[in-house]
UniProtKB/Swiss-Prot annotation:
Keywords: Acetylation, Actin-binding, Cytoplasm, Cytoskeleton, Isopeptide bond, Phosphoprotein, Ubl conjugation. GO terms for biological process: actin cytoskeleton organization; positive regulation of actin filament bundle assembly; regulation of actin filament polymerization. The gene is PFN1. It comes from Bos taurus. InterPro entries: PFN, PFN_euk, PFN_sf, Profilin1/2/3_vertebrate, Profilin_CS. This is Profilin-1. Belongs to the profilin family. The modification N-acetylalanine is found at residue 2. The lineage of its organism: Eukaryota, Metazoa, Chordata, Craniata, Vertebrata.
Length: 140
């Protein structure tokens, strides 16, 4: 799905994000486009299944993983009409910095963004939501 790389380029253009991905979640979940060599390119079908699954209760206790990166769930509105967003933060290992992540959902895709160190989660959320809104208008 090479055409999706332009969406990744657009999401990364202003320099506030360190990672981005477009993931198809219907039928056979897979990464359609992502920043090469970063975390989201490694997202597994099992991780996608957990993200879009009906069981939302364990997120806040256990967190979840994206591309093998452990994350804490801050706010889960992914399955709520009109919102379709989930805000997360990476878990620190060995005192490393943590980063804000937003996941937004469309009819066929998940849009994922990870901000750079010090970038406010609200900025990432807004950018991710706007891309998802564009994809929804384009029937994705």
């Amino acid at each position: 799905m090479a055409g999706w790389n332009a969406y990744i380029d657009n999401l990364m253009a202003d320099g506030t994000c360190q990672d981005a991905a477009i993931v198809g979640y219907k039928d056979s979940p897979s990464v359609w486009a992502a920043v090469p060599g970063k975390t989201f390119v490694n997202i597994t079908p099992a991780e996608v299944g957990i993200l879009v699954g009906k069981d939302r209760s364990s997120f806040f206790v256990n967190g979840l993983t994206l591309g093998g990166q452990k994350c804490s769930v801050i706010r889960d509105s992914l399955l709520q009409d009109g919102e379709f967003t989930m805000d997360l933060r990476t878990k620190s290992t060995g005192g490393a910095p943590t980063f804000n992540i937003t996941v937004t959902m469309t009819a066929k895709t998940l849009v994922l963004l990870m901000g750079k160190e010090g970038v406010h989660g609200g900025m990432i959320n807004k950018k991710c939501y706007e891309m998802a809104s564009h994809l929804r208008r384009s029937q994705y």
